[in-house]
C-alpha cells in the first residue's frame, strides 16, 4: 500500500480540494421579461441579449 513520504501541508491539501465544492449558479434577471434566468442562456420568453431569437407558443397547448 502506498504511504506518503512527507506530510502534505494544509495549504497544499486545500489547493488539492479547491475544485471539490458546491458552486453558486450564475443567475440574473432578464431585462425584457423581468424573470430570473441563467446567464448566457435563453429566457422562457425566447429572448437572448434583449433580442427575440425564438418564437414562443403562448397558447398553453
Swiss-Prot record:
Sample GO molecular function, one term: structural constituent of ribosome
Keywords: Ribonucleoprotein, Ribosomal protein
Entry's family note: Belongs to the bacterial ribosomal protein bL32 family.
The keyword Cell division is annotated on this UniProt entry: no
GO cellular component terms, semicolon-separated: large ribosomal subunit
Matching PANTHER family: 50S RIBOSOMAL PROTEIN L32, LARGE RIBOSOMAL SUBUNIT PROTEIN BL32
Name of the protein in its database record: Large ribosomal subunit protein bL32
Any matching Pfam family: Ribosomal_L32p
InterPro entries in alphabetical order: Ribosomal_bL32, Ribosomal_bL32_bact, Ribosomal_zn-bd
Organism domain of life: Bacteria
GO biological process: translation
